[in-house]
Amino acid sequence: MEWSPVAKVYDPLKAGSIDGTDVEPHDAGVWRAMLARYKPNRGVCGDPDLTLFVARLNPQTTEEKLRDVFSKFGDIRRLRLVRDVVTGFSKRYAFIEYKEERSLKRAWRDANKLILDQYELLVDVEQERTLPGWRPRRLGGGQGGQKESGQLRFGGRDRPFRKPINLSTRRPAEPRGRETERERDRRDYRDRRHERTHTEDRTHRHTY
């Protein structure tokens, strides 16, 4: 399979690994995500292929401010700032659905790491309905995260996979007891150098 810095299918075990090569989970969250069964929320409206995920918002940022900023990239069909159902406080992330794909692509390209109300935004495509096998953060999955949490997840825009070291690309080892071409070259060079030095010494002795 061709290597990619972003996941095409969500695998909790790979998401917990910086290069996607772990064979055992390294934290309890990965275990929880591997055992979890998750189905996308059917109550979510809109076209997932035209929807952006906007995270790391200032808790004070409002729907109106988001609409004002993101409408500069194109016409918005829907905007939902996710809030706590009890307190009404912002959960610091939102979903924005555009009317056209070119608007989504423009916002995806230009709005990521944009500073809004003194906070740097993370902007990516929606994953819940577009990435097969998706597990949300509350089940131990998700993507990104902060080092302090101890549960970093890789394979997304925020923390893409690092390309693993491919040991198969190394030169095959020569069989033991067999002189390599490089070793022969070195030996020949030493022999020639020794012979030349020995000849020069004899010449000097004869000269005197």
Curated annotation (Swiss-Prot):
The keyword Ion transport does not apply. Residues 133-208 are annotated as: Disordered. One of its GO terms (molecular function) is snRNA binding. Its main location: nucleus. Residues 50-128 form the RRM domain. Residues 171-208 have a biased composition (Basic and acidic residues). The gene is snrnp35. This is U11/U12 small nuclear ribonucleoprotein 35 kDa protein. Keywords: Nucleus, RNA-binding. It comes from the Eukaryota. CDD domains: RRM_snRNP35. It is found in: Nucleus. One of its GO terms (biological process) is mRNA splicing, via spliceosome. GO terms for cellular component: U12-type spliceosomal complex. The keyword Nucleus applies.
